[in-house]
Amino acid sequence: MAAPVGPVKFWRPGTEGPGVSISEERQSLAENSGTTVVYNPYAALSIEQQRQKLPVFKLRNHILYLIENYQTVVIVGETGCGKSTQIPQYLAEAGWTAEGRVVGVTQPRRVAAVTVAGRVAEERGAVLGHEVGYCIRFDDCTDQLATRIKFLTDGMLVREMMVDPLLTKYSVIMLDEAHERTLYTDIAIGLLKKIQKKRGDLRLIVASATLDADKFRDFFNQNETSDPARDTCVILTVEGRTFPVDIFYLQSPVPDYIKSTVETVVKIHQTEGDGDVLAFLTGQEEVETVVSMLIEQARALARTGMKRHLRVLPMYAGLPSFEQMKVFERVSRSVRKVIVATNVAETSITISGIVYVIDCGFVKLRAYNPRTAIECLVVVPVSQASANQRAGRGGRSRSGKCYRLYTEEAFDKLPQSTVPEMQRSNLAPVILQLKALGIDNVLRFHFMSPPPAQSMVQALELLYALGGLDKDCRLTEPLGMRIAEFPLNPMFAKMLLESGNFGCSQEILSIAAMMQIQNIFVVPPNQKSHAIRVHRKFAVEEGDHLTMLNIYEAFIKHNKDSKWCQEHFLNYKGLVRAATVREQLKKLLVKFQVPRKSSEGDPDLVLRCIVSGFFANAARFHSTGAYRTIRDDHELHIHPASVLYAEKPPRWVIYNEVIQTSKYYMRDVTAIESAWLLELAPHFYQQGTHLSLKAKRAKVQDP
């Protein structure tokens, strides 16, 4: 088919490209800490009428029949078919929550667990937290006696198994959005298969928005004969309301999909009929860039006398809910809506009125390189499954068109599906959880997609260095078990547990809590320089960790005042959440009898404590003007958002995480003394042969 925009070349992720920015989300990606809205197009109808309008309603009795007769049911249904909100209610109505039993529904994202729980509670006329509740990290909104439908993240389900390995209170577990194949979805999948062998009465529903159902069926089906009548797993497809979508490819690649997205929107607006536009990009920064460019284009078109106007709206998980709701608002016939979104709009929400889809062909994923032991966010080409999901967004209300900003040949070379997180993540938290659940031989654990052996070895080495595993790779007592109990990266857990010994548990609690929050700084586009000047008042020469401590302490000193946050361009909701997280972490420190101590303003105590947890993330300034990791000599740079950026580079630093755009950038960076690494982590920098040991020691010792 004809190409919608002109010929140019693709840029490769990892090279300098105008479509990529260094101001990116935290490792968690914005979905986990943002707000997701639940849009209801049938709000004018009664609750019962609304429920009956959903495609899944026609299959209610059939779904209940299959759950009664099969241990596992794989349900394939597009976003908006009602599977997430209705199936748990069908189960409750059919008696699966009688006699104190619970239906559990997992979500890969915290915000989805909260918002879907809220919608189900509303439909049932219940108070959220009573019959219907949710449980996410640092926030348990359930009643142990009353809750019968429980929404929770897959990570929290795995944590529940540490207390109740057979999940005895649950009659049914529904793994929702299983196609996302997150780290903890995959662990839950493997563990639930083990539980099913011991609990024949436990029913499992695997809900997916993509056609990967065969993989799930093959994994869970315990029928070892050739007789299909003995299958324990079955697939059911919920037909949605879809229309054909014409696909348009480029004739030759483009170098800048940001610019091409804008050009394609303008071309659609000038040449195509009615219908709204949905454009997919990789992150918040790109979305905001395209929105501002399109607003300029819309003004220019209005000046030419064009009667139909453009209403340009952003959509990403970190956007406040009232801003997200704007994408669902109806507009007059003289206005065309253009929604510029991240992949949150791929399967998480359904927006009516979309006829035209623009797919940039890329997505931002977390990726771990076991050779360098660096985990970072990286922009990579989408999978064919994701590209098809994106295209399908244009065929919900009538036939649509999808403009792919890449060639058909490029599409044919895309991977069929996204690589599961299990095969591209740092596995230290996974191994720790499995060990805590009594699975000693993690290499033989039944993973749906086995992780690379090198990643497993790296994770075991880090956990041994942290003191969480002994030389036989068994969980240590009490340190290993305690690290496993923290709902945090093992490095954070070790830092917190050591804080009493360093005499700074009060400060470390605040720092750890602040590091879990995304986007503490607010930078309005029209007040950028002023906001940055105000932010500098909190900065200290030691780096980002103590700067975050300063901000938190100032917030508490000013009685958590929202007006004070506004005046200082700080994220009020984020700081309130940091205070909540801190309280939860404090309870764990009390449980483990970590002394309540303050450093009384001595920064070295705090910095040494941080090194005790994050020694593996150390880098040294090199004569080339960049930093180098100590163990494998990998090049890193200080992120422009760091208070250390544009200052005289410290010789030695530690960092929380790395993101990759045009370079590898360290985020949350703090200056340290090299001697602290040898003092606090000799076991990490003294492994291997005598020769390599000498080389490592030489690297860490200042000349």
UniProtKB/Swiss-Prot annotation:
Binding site for ATP: 77-84
InterPro entries, alphabetized: DEAD-box_helicase_OB_fold, DNA/RNA_helicase_DEAH_CS, HA2_WH, Helicase-assoc_dom, Helicase_ATP-bd, Helicase_C-like, P-loop_NTPase
Chain span(s) of sequence motif DEAH box: 176-179
Family annotation (SUPFAM superfamilies): P-loop containing nucleoside triphosphate hydrolases
UniProt superkingdom: Eukaryota
CDD domains xref list: DEXHc_DHX35, SF2_C_RHA
Name of the top EC class for this enzyme: hydrolase
Residue span, Helicase ATP-binding domain: 64-229
Pfam assignment, any one: HA2_C
E.C. number(s) listed in UniProt: 3.6.4.13
UniProt entry tagged with the keyword Zinc: no
Domain Helicase C-terminal positions: 261-438
GO molecular function: ATP binding; ATP hydrolysis activity; helicase activity; RNA binding; RNA helicase activity
A GO-annotated cellular component: nucleoplasm
GO biological process: in utero embryonic development; mRNA splicing, via spliceosome
Catalytic activity field: ATP + H2O = ADP + phosphate + H(+)
Keyword list, A-Z: ATP-binding, Helicase, Hydrolase, mRNA processing, mRNA splicing, Nucleotide-binding, Spliceosome
Subunit relationships: Identified in the spliceosome C complex.
Function: May be involved in pre-mRNA splicing.
Family: Belongs to the DEAD box helicase family. DEAH subfamily.
Protein name, entry field: Probable ATP-dependent RNA helicase DHX35
